[in-house]
Amino acid sequence: MKHSLIKRVFRITMVILVIFFVCPFKNIHGEEIDEKNEIINSAKQIFEDRNKAILNGNLKLIESKYDKNTKYGIWAYEHEEKKMKYLKNWEEKQGAKFIEIIPDIVIKRVRGSDDKFSINLICSTEYKYIYKDAPKFINSCRIGTSHILNMVKKDGRWIITKEWYKDPFEDSLNLDNLKVDSVKQYILSQSKRDFSSMTDRRRSSVEYADRYCGIASEKKYGYTYNKKYRNYNSRGGDCANFASQVLHEGGKFRKNSAWNYDRSGATSSWLNADGFKNYMIYSGRASVIAHGSYEKVYKASYRLIPGDFVAYEKKGDITHISVVTGADSRGYSLVSCHNTDRNRVPWDLGWSDKNIKFWLVHVNY
C-alpha cells in the first residue's frame, strides 16, 4: 500500500512538472511565431503603402513609415522622398504615368525580439505605366532589390529606423537641366516597333536575359541567377558577367582567350564593364550607334534592337552594362541587367543624372 502511494505521488509530481515546464514554453513559442508573423505582415504593408504613396504623391504616408527621431530613419525617409520626386520628373519627361506598382516580397530572415527586429528580404517590384495620350496600352517592367530593414514598434505601429538597399534610382535624382518639352514631344511621336523578324540568336539572347535576371525575373524562375556562373555582386558588380552570359549562352558567341569564363575565373573583358564595352567594339563584334549625354543620344536610342547593349559612363569610367531586351508601346528601348536587377526597364530609368553619358552599342550577331 505504501509502495502504491509513493508511485501515485511520483506520477502526480511528474505531471505537475510537465505542465510547469512544457506548457509555458509552448505559449512562449507560439507568441514568438505570432510576433514574427506580425512584423512580416507589417513590413509587407509598408512596401505596399509606399508604392501607393508614390502613385498618389502622398508624402505624408511615406513619412509615417519612418522613425524620424533617429538619423538613419531620417535618411531612409529622405531617400524615399527623392525617389518619389524623381519618378514624377521622369513621368513628365516621358509623357507617361505610372498606374500601378506591385511588390512581391520574399522574406529571407527575421531576427530580434520584443519591439525591435531586423528583416532581410528581397522585393520584385512590377511597375506598370501608360503614355498619357494612349492610356489603353499598358507597359510593364520589373526591378528587383535586396533589403535590410530595422524596425521598432512605437505606439502600436511598426516603423523603420534604418533601411539599406541598392536603390536603382540613386544615380537619377536630377532631371532639372533637361529640355523636357522637346524630349516628350519626340517620344510621344514614336510608334510601337515590330521585332518579329529578329534573328534566332537575338531572340535566344532575350530569352536568356528574361530567365536569369534574378530578382527582376518572373516568380516562376525563383528570382535566381544562373548557378552555373559565379555571382560577382559582392565583388564589384555582376552586370558585365550577365551581359557576357547573354551573348554566350543566348547569342551563341564563342569564348576566346580575351573573352572567357571558366572554373578558375573570368577575363576582364568578360567581367569588367569597361573591359566588356571595349572588347565588343574593338573586336568587331559590336559597333557604336551613339555616345554622349541623354539629350544627345535619346533619338538614336530608337535604333537599338533586342540583343544590343547600353553602357553607362560616369566621370570617364564605364560603371554599368545593360542588355536591350525589347521596346514599349512607344518604341522606347527596354533593358535588362544584374546588380540592381532589371527586367525590360526603360533604358534611362534610374540613369538621369546630368553627368552620366551613354554608349548605345549595336551587337553584330
Question: Can you describe what each PLM-predicted range is?
Answer:
Residues 5-30:
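Sec-dependent N-terminal signal peptides of Gram-positive bacterial secreted proteins and lipoproteins
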Residues 187-270:
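N-terminal capping segments
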